[in-house]
């Protein structure tokens, strides 16, 4: 009874804090660029959310007697906790990683918000594990898969950001090209010496400004691309270990390493997509933009694999889904 009450309290605290964080991010996004007070409140809220989720997982573990990996609700809680870990590690190391934190914070907010919302109320109660899940492989397989999903989602979102910035800049350049002398086909820098001093200064200032913007944009995109590559590489390792451990577990439980179950099929598709991403990074003939497109596709594939199959409740991996077996 005590554990159930504590779990209930932690769930409501985390949901309340997440709701406040959503409001803070919406205010920052829609009305103001940056307010120090709101930024500090967001950081403190993330810390509170992290400890609430940690306490929730530990309480559920002690109360149920098994690792909290048995259904969609518990895996979502663990997923949001994994996102929080990626946020907290740089925080405790006193090292700032603005790019990852910008991606991680909304991920924690919406994952935890969905998990603790009324949509999954029926799954909030801890239940006894079904026989197929009563295995020591549960921790190895599920934890590696969730770590892989979380890491790959963070890296994929960085790639999505690269595409958004690239195409946004492309649209702006096309729209404003007529306003710049040096973007006009009839203009050449040799004509500067025939201009008066005012026009000459205007052209040079615009040229300098555009060069600075291009340099800053290039550096920014390179940093996003570098962190995206590192994050996806780590997530690919987690995903590979998770798939292999799952195959070993399947052989023990069902007598076959691979059954082409919907979850297994989409896990293989996810693995293939990110294998292609890593291949494009190693191939110098392929541009970085192409790898970002592949990673962005992978972002959608992960959600189909992780959430879509569970919501449909089909196949051997439908434990704890909306649709009963």
UniProtKB/Swiss-Prot annotation:
Pfam families: Cytochrom_C_asm. InterPro entries: Cyt_c_assembly (IPR002541), Cyt_c_biogenesis_CcsA (IPR017562), Cyt_c_biogenesis_CcsA/CcmC (IPR045062). The gene is ccsA. Required during biogenesis of c-type cytochromes (cytochrome c6 and cytochrome f) at the step of heme attachment. GO terms for cellular component: chloroplast thylakoid membrane. HAMAP family: CytC_CcsA. This is Cytochrome c biogenesis protein CcsA. May interact with Ccs1. It is a multi-pass membrane protein. It is found in: Plastid, Chloroplast thylakoid membrane. GO terms for molecular function: heme binding. The keyword Aminoacyl-tRNA synthetase does not apply. Its main location: plastid. Keywords: Chloroplast, Cytochrome c-type biogenesis, Membrane, Plastid, Thylakoid, Transmembrane, Transmembrane helix. The keyword Oxidoreductase does not apply. The chain crosses the membrane at residues 12-32, 45-65, 72-92, 100-120, 145-165, 231-251, 264-281, 293-313. Belongs to the CcmF/CycK/Ccl1/NrfE/CcsA family. One of its GO terms (biological process) is cytochrome complex assembly.
């Amino acid at each position: 009874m005590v554990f159930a009450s504590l779990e209930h309290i932690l769930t409501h605290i985390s949901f309340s804090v997440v709701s406040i964080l959503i409001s803070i991010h919406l205010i920052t996004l829609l009305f103001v660029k940056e307010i120090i007070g709101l930024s500090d409140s967001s950081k403190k809220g993330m810390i509170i959310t992290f400890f609430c989720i940690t306490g929730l997982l530990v309480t559920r573990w002690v109360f149920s007697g098994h690792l909290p990996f048995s259904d969609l609700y518990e895996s979502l809680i663990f997923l949001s906790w994994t996102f929080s870990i990626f946020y907290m590690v740089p925080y405790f190391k006193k090292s700032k990683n603005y790019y990852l934190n910008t991606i991680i914070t909304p991920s924690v907010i919406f994952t935890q918000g969905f998990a603790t919302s009324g949509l999954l109320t029926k799954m909030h109660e801890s239940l006894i594990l079904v026989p197929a899940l009563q295995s020591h492989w549960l921790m190895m397989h599920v934890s590696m898969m969730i770590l892989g999903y979380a890491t790959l989602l963070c890296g994929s979102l960085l790639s999505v950001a690269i595409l958004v910035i690239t195409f946004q800049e492309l649209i702006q350049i096309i729209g404003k090209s007529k306003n710049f002398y040096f973007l006009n086909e009839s203009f050449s820098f040799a004509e500067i010496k025939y201009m008066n001093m005012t026009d000459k200064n205007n052209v040079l200032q615009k040229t300098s400004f555009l060069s600075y913007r291009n340099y800053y944009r290039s550096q920014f995109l390179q940093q996003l691309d570098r962190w995206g590559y590192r994050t996806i590489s780590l997530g690919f390792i987690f995903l590979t270990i998770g798939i292999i451990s799952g195959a070993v577990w399947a052989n023990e439980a069902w007598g076959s390493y691979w059954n082409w179950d919907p979850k297994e099929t989409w896990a293989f598709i996810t693995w293939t997509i990110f294998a292609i991403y890593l291949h494009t990074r190693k191939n110098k003939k392929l541009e970085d933009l192409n790898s970002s497109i592949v990673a962005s596709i992978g972002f959608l594939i992960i959600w189909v694999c992780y959430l879509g199959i569970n919501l449909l409740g089909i196949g051997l991996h439908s434990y704890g889904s909306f649709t009963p077996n």
